[in-house]
Curated annotation (Swiss-Prot):
Upper classification of the organism: Bacteria, Bacillati, Bacillota, Bacilli, Bacillales
Residues spanning the membrane: 16-36, 55-75, 102-122, 128-148
Gene source species: Oceanobacillus iheyensis (strain DSM 14371 / CIP 107618 / JCM 11309 / KCTC 3954 / HTE831)
Disulfide links within the chain: none
Topology with respect to the bilayer: Multi-pass membrane protein
PANTHER family: MEMBRANE PROTEIN (PTHR40064:SF1), MEMBRANE PROTEIN-RELATED (PTHR40064)
Protein's UniProt name: UPF0421 protein OB2406
Length: 346
């Protein structure tokens, strides 16, 4: 476990794949160099990527080997052969959209120039077989040895995102409802950008796990992961609504002290629940949603008395209320899904 955490699972798997590939090639009596090169580049973050890219790298390597044999036959072992092998391999792979196999194909092509001396056709097929060995061994190692499992990592990130989002919800509404804090708005924008990056990283891991779920997950595990993905989706939409609030053009906020305190109270409640400082209670959510809806319709009725010039854009008071109602509903959805996840775990 210490070794795995120190150098990483992919590095360990790459080393094992290289070792097994070299042993197999030595046992058959073939040079392991090309098989090892293929094995190194085939270990991907997910098993599905290893298989998908392997199916691209095999024909790409065949193209590289074919060009190497062709130009060796025409020009012998010369600088021209190296150049033409590289150029034609890159061009052909690019034209055929074999982008994931371009690097290994080019390396195979130029490396073959120095090792082929006779029997060109036999050398070509040997390279295809060694490439197949490298692809197969790496894919099997990636699938069965320390298989990629991002679920715990994603779950940890989801929890961290929820807590940070809670801080931002409370901080942004406090900032907007206090004139002396309005200068801190840019600080919250920067924090929202950082939070967006964290969400994107979690979404990338989620895609990795989704791609590999058909290889390793039991039905129960798939349900758990589906719940975690749904929670991440709700957090993404919360972030979107919060960004809408802070990005909306602002003028002087026309809101009385009672309404201001209600907004601050609800934003603080959401923050405490997301940060797990307060236990989630669906009745509390319903109560706060009812009060916010009353404020929203009251504010909307007030805007009917405004002039048409003032209604060219939605009043910021309505924006704050609408977005907070949306965030509150998403908070309820988030914890409903979290409770489902706990039930599935049991």
């Amino acid at each position: 476990m210490k070794l795995r955490s120190f150098i990483g699972s992919r590095v360990i798997k790459t080393g094992i794949a290289v070792l097994l590939t070299a042993y197999i090639c030595e046992w058959i009596g073939w040079s392991p160099v090309f098989a090892v090169i293929t094995a190194i580049v085939t270990i991907e973050p997910t098993v599905s990527d290893s298989i998908r890219k392997g199916l691209i790298r095999f024909p790409a390597s065949a193209i590289g080997a074919a060009y190497a044999v062709l130009f060796i036959a025409l020009f012998g072992n010369s600088p021209v052969t190296y150049a033409l092998s590289a150029v034609f391999t890159i061009t052909t792979c690019f034209r055929l959209k074999l982008h994931d196999g371009l690097l290994v194909a080019t390396i195979t092509s130029v490396a073959m120039v120095d090792v082929i001396h006779s029997n060109y056709v036999m050398e070509f097929f040997i390279r295809l077989f060694t490439t197949t060995i490298g692809l197969s061994v790496s894919t099997l190692v990636n699938m069965f040895l320390l298989p990629p499992d991002y679920q715990k990592n994603i779950q940890t990130k989801v929890s961290s995102i929820a807590q940070e989002l809670g801080k931002q919800i409370q901080g942004i509404y406090y900032c907007l409802l206090h004139v002396d804090e309005i200068n801190n708005e840019s600080k919250y924008l920067d924090k929202l950008l950082e939070l967006d990056k964290l969400i994107i990283r979690a979404e990338i891991l989620s895609r990795y796990q989704t791609n590999d779920s058909k290889y390793h997950f039991t039905e129960n595990n798939q349900e758990k992961f589906k719940d975690i993905k749904t929670q991440l989706h709700f957090l993404r939409i919360m972030h979107y609504h919060l960004t809408n609030v802070i990005d909306h053009p602002k003028e002087q906020i026309n809101i009385d002290e009672k309404e201001k305190n209600e907004l601050l109270n609800v934003s603080s409640y959401i923050a405490q629940v997301l940060k797990k400082e307060l236990a989630y209670n669906s009745d509390d959510i319903q109560d706060k949603r009812t009060r916010l809806n009353e404020l929203f319709w009251k504010e909307k009725h007030r805007t009917h008395n405004l002039s048409s010039d003032m209604l060219n854009k939605l009043p910021f008071e309505l924006v704050m209320l609408y977005e907070l109602i949306s965030i509150l509903e998403l908070t309820e959805d988030y914890f409903y899904t979290a409770n489902l996840h706990k039930e599935n775990a049991n």
